[in-house]
Amino acid sequence: MPIAASLRVLLLNGPNLSLLGRREVDVYGTVTLADIERTLQLDAQDLDVELSCLQSNHEGVLIDAIHDAFGRCDGLVINPGGLTHTSVALRDAIAGVGLPTVEVHMSNVYRRESFRHHSFIAPVAVGQISGFGADSYRLGLRAIALFLRRRAEQDEGPCR
């Protein structure tokens, strides 16, 4: 059986990421979230992925989006921002819907302050990409698309 080509992926960005390009440019550079989303939409076309994007400074909005993604999306790419290190609720939402998730960070969180070294999201994600600037997002999108397609190939094996 042929594998459905088009994947549906939700990109979530947490608190303060709307300030990319203006905030801590020595850490994050001058690229804006709008720039990142434009690039990802082009990448998504090449990957045959339907990409939806949402940024919120509010934990509950992100949790609602994760809940709403259940049954509508195949996977998630998330940069939880500061919620990475604090939000059990965000972690539980991801675990609860069971959607494959890739966690991304522009900076290498393990080369920064020690409080950034712990992620509540990583244990429920299929992978984590950090330290490649805006390319962390591009790598994250490619990673989730590859993961989902490989999983679909296994599910659609020759005798199924």
Curated annotation (Swiss-Prot):
Active site: 28, 105
Keyword match Zinc: no
Reactions performed catalytically: 3-dehydroquinate = 3-dehydroshikimate + H2O
Positions of substrate binding: 79, 85, 92, 106-107, 116
EC assignment: 4.2.1.10
Pathway annotation: Metabolic intermediate biosynthesis; chorismate biosynthesis; chorismate from D-erythrose 4-phosphate and phosphoenolpyruvate: step 3/7
Keywords, sorted A to Z: Amino-acid biosynthesis, Aromatic amino acid biosynthesis, Lyase
UniProt subunit comment: Homododecamer.
Function according to Swiss-Prot or TrEMBL: Catalyzes a trans-dehydration via an enolate intermediate.
Name of the protein this chain belongs to: 3-dehydroquinate dehydratase
Organism of this sequence: Gloeobacter violaceus (strain ATCC 29082 / PCC 7421)
Species lineage: Bacteria, Bacillati, Cyanobacteriota, Cyanophyceae, Gloeobacterales
